[in-house]
Amino acid sequence: LSEELYIKMNARGLQLSPFDNFKADLTNFISNNAYEGFKQMVPLYKKDSSYEVEFNFNFSVKLDAKWIDIFWKKGFENFDAAYMSFFSRFFAIKYILASKDTVSDRDMRQDAILRKLYTDAEDRADMNEYLGFQEFEQLLSSHPEYIMTLDKVFDVFYEHDYKDSKKTIFKQLLPY
């Protein structure tokens, strides 16, 4: 658990939610990973800011200060669980796509990693329980670029009023 998160949560007087633990693990993973993309200098997410920071720091800021609004503004009663479900589903889909050539559809239904990334993670979110970051770390260690894609997806969802044109969102989500 990062010192920053510990201080923030103690200041609020709340026990860490499963999603708070997940965010801490995810941001620690990104900060401590040698992937070149995580060290890139990017504009700091903040209105009218001219500062540049490393991607890993900016991701952490957007995780807490920007993207949460996607779920909060939609009126989810438990927006932490909705946010966590998005992560679980996103990484499960990325895992399925990465494994489709080596794992049959039948075997995929029984796949232990997929079960932990998606089914078990969804159940744990509903029960307000956190059992760790191991499966996410295993996937992201092999595919750190998934974080870059996730960053792009969240930014597009946040910036775009998707009621107007689904085609625009689709074009913005195409891979680099």
Locations of the language-model features?
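Flexible coil/loop and intrinsically disordered segments
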Residues: 1-176
